[in-house]
Amino acid sequence: MAQGPSQCPALLGAPASTTDGTQEARVPLDGAFWIPRPPAGSPKGCFACVSKPPALQAAAAPAPEPSASPPMAPTLFPMESKSSKTDSVRASGVPQACKHLAEKKTMTNPTTVIEVYPDTTEVNDYYLWSIFNFVYLNFCCLGFIALAYSLKVRDKKLLNDLNGAVEDAKTARLFNITSSALAASCIILIFIFLRYPLTDY
């Protein structure tokens, strides 16, 4: 029985099927490029930094045996931007640096600030002189005032206040000189009156 024209594939222009199992090569589309698939498996974190590079791992893997099945065509991806292409190339087997090491490199070193304080050790506080005047020559409590200023000088020296320590040291010296001079004058007058009493005149 003869077949009609609608049932004959040759009349419709359809290609005849092949029996050898081969497949026609796919023609790449316009505006597309080929990108190999990234290696399977999740990253191992910091241990991936010290592991073997991908090139050595690929060389150690056994070669695939030839099979009778036809080779599979590579996967076709659409056009991507430049940044996406760079990321794809990095994921295709190029070893990347550890992210923890990258974070350490980006961290800036903290700056060390050294504060230089003025030298207050050369400021004289007249502490011993003030104690002597307070104990022996405390004329009108001037020795006590001088001792108070001497203690203020010591406190300001601990606080590294050079200007305040110098001013209080000058005041303590002034009170010490005044107390010593007045007390010494009183002692001399007392000795004179004891040596030459007023009844002799």
UniProtKB/Swiss-Prot annotation:
Residues 1-127, 195-201 are extracellular. It is a multi-pass membrane protein. PANTHER family: INTERFERON INDUCIBLE TRANSMEMBRANE PROTEIN, INTERFERON-INDUCED TRANSMEMBRANE PROTEIN 10. Keywords: Cell membrane, Lipoprotein, Membrane, Palmitate, Transmembrane, Transmembrane helix. This is Interferon-induced transmembrane protein 10. Residues 1-23, 60-88 are annotated as: Disordered. Its main location: membrane. It holds the Pfam family CD225. The lineage of its organism: Eukaryota, Metazoa, Chordata, Craniata, Vertebrata. It comes from Mus musculus. A lipid is attached at residues 140-141 (S-palmitoyl cysteine). Residues 149-173 are cytoplasmic. One of its GO terms (cellular component) is plasma membrane. Belongs to the CD225/Dispanin family. InterPro entries: CD225/Dispanin_fam, IFITM_antiviral_protein.
